[in-house]
Amino acid sequence: IGLMLKLLSKDQIVLMPTTNSAYGTGDKDNYCNEESPLRPISQYAIEKVEIEQELMEQLNAISFRLATVFGMSPRMRIDLLVNDFTYRAVNDRFVVLFESHFKRNYIHVRDVSRVFQHALNNHDVMKGEIYNVGLSDANVSKKELCEYIQKQVPDFIFIDEQIGKDPDQRNYIVSNEKIESTGFKTEFSLDRGIGELLKGYTMIKNSLYGNV
């Protein structure tokens, strides 16, 4: 990516998906906006931070710090939290939670595509900036996420394990006010996405693509 950025013309528009996992654990209140210090934990987040630093040297670049993505797509990422927990609700009917109070922000995959379209249509006023992209009403803990799922799968059981530690220590509340101030509004709620996943997983469970 560094080589690609060096070869770009000055007029080239660059829209880059980065990640809000770069915030790591947030401040003392776990609150993060685009000015918050970055504390990446995973190698993935560390490399995304390095890429973003190079990216923002480009005058026409925009970085989207995406929340954890969810929703049906042609080739699923079941390891992402909403997709994962909903899959477990369909197939296992239970999940064991470690550090269930840890919070994350979420965004539907179709809203991700919509924010790229929004940036292309509003590039002149958005360029040269970093934007968090997530659902402002979906800064929720793992336990709260399970409660969202349980509303649609009443027999889904989640167990809050008091012993043990989640290897993923991300815990933060993310502000999306900056991207919203440009006129971007999300369309796909957490409830809607969970319903979509439940339907999708039920349809593909016994198909050739049941492992997606």
Regions found by a protein language model. Give the residues of each.
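Short-chain dehydrogenase/reductase
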Residues: 30, 36, 41-49, 75-83, ...
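Active-site Tyr-X1-5-Lys
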Residues: 25-28, 39-65, 90-91
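Conserved Rossmann-fold NAD(P)-dependent oxidoreductase catalytic core, especially the SDR/UDP-sugar
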Residues: 2-43
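Hydrophobic alpha-helix immediately C-terminal to the catalytic Tyr-X-X-X-Lys motif of short-chain
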Residues: 50, 54, 85, 145, ...
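Conserved sequence/active-site signature of Rossmann-fold short-chain dehydrogenase/reductase
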Residues: 22, 69-71, 112, 138
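C-terminal substrate-binding subdomain of Rossmann-fold SDR/epimerase-dehydratase oxidoreductases
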Residues: 92-93, 97-212
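Hydrophobic positions on the long internal alpha-helix
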Residues: 4-8, 54-55, 115, 119
